[in-house]
């Protein structure tokens, strides 16, 4: 019980502390950081290809990113659940 409370307190701290650390800081994704670093290192760099689909807004881009992550997590956990169920079935035999 004590271990559970300590873990819950740590999770709560990890969720709350980022709001107070670097308050008012700018959030940027890794794509933007990579693009700025490429401009510093090689200002004449030209991309090899253009995206097949450019989302209409940042919200749609975030939605597609989230859906991609959710689908990947669903596939991974389906495989893990299937393997665990199969192992339990084999243990009964």
Swiss-Prot record:
Chief location bin: membrane
Gene name tied to this protein: cbiN
Annotated protein name in UniProt: Cobalt transport protein CbiN
Organism lineage string: Bacteria, Pseudomonadati, Pseudomonadota, Gammaproteobacteria, Enterobacterales
Pathway as given in its UniProt record: Cofactor biosynthesis; adenosylcobalamin biosynthesis
Any one Gene Ontology molecular-function term assigned to this protein's record: cobalt ion transmembrane transporter activity
Function: Part of the energy-coupling factor (ECF) transporter complex CbiMNOQ involved in cobalt import.
Protein family according to the UniProt entry: Belongs to the CbiN family.
Organism encoding this protein: Klebsiella pneumoniae subsp. pneumoniae (strain ATCC 700721 / MGH 78578)
GO terms (BP aspect): cobalamin biosynthetic process
Cystine residue pairs: none
Keyword Transport carried by entry: yes
Self-association and partners: Forms an energy-coupling factor (ECF) transporter complex composed of an ATP-binding protein (A component, CbiO), a transmembrane protein (T component, CbiQ) and 2 possible substrate-capture proteins (S components, CbiM and CbiN) of unknown stoichimetry.
Gene Ontology cellular-component annotations: plasma membrane
Signal peptide stretch: none
Coiled-coil annotated residue ranges, if any: none
TM segment ranges: 5-25, 63-83
Keyword set, alphabetical order: Cell inner membrane, Cell membrane, Cobalamin biosynthesis, Cobalt, Cobalt transport, Ion transport, Membrane, Transmembrane, Transmembrane helix, Transport
């Amino acid at each position: 019980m004590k271990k559970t409370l300590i873990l819950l307190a740590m999770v709560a701290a990890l969720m709350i502390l980022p709001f107070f650390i670097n308050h008012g800081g700018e959030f940027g994704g890794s794509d933007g950081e990579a693009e700025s670093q490429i401009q510093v290192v090689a200002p004449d760099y030209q991309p090899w290809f253009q995206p097949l689909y450019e989302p209409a807004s940042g919200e749609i881009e975030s939605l597609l990113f989230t859906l991609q992550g959710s689908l990947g997590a669903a596939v991974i956990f389906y495989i893990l659940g299937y393997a665990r169920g199969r192992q339990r079935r084999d243990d009964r035999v």
